[in-house]
Amino acid sequence: MEGRPPVWIGHVVLGVDDVDSSAEFWRGIGMREVERNPHVAVLELRGGTHLVLVPGDPPADADAPFDVMVEDLDETHSAWKALGLDPSPIERGRIHASFTVRDPNGYRVTVNSSHVVGDV
């Protein structure tokens, strides 16, 4: 298969305690807000996938149902630390390096290094 695959993830829905504070967190780490009302926030990731934040009861101490990838993991780790977040130490794996950070709802989000170079 040449070029991009013909399918991709369109939306991921996350139940949150507070849509406003959650949207602020995700915007702060680099997502673009594309829709907002009192009951939902839609944020766009690179590649066009949308994270949809809706009121809900997030499970205590849960992993987010997705992970994110960034171009420069070390730079991202430092930048998020400077924002006052508390990223875990970076772990260097065989395929990815990664760290975790908690969002305002307690979801543990894994942040991976990218293994793709160039536009995706």
Show which residues each predicted segment covers.
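Core segments of cupin and vicinal oxygen chelate
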Residues: 6-7, 13-50
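Residue-level signal for secondary-structure boundary sites
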Residues: 51, 74-76, 119
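Vicinal oxygen chelate
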Residues: 1-5, 8-17, 41, 57-120
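Conserved short beta-strand elements that form part of the metal-binding/catalytic scaffold
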Residues: 32-64, 108-114
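A generic local structural motif
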Residues: 1, 28-29, 53-55, 86-87
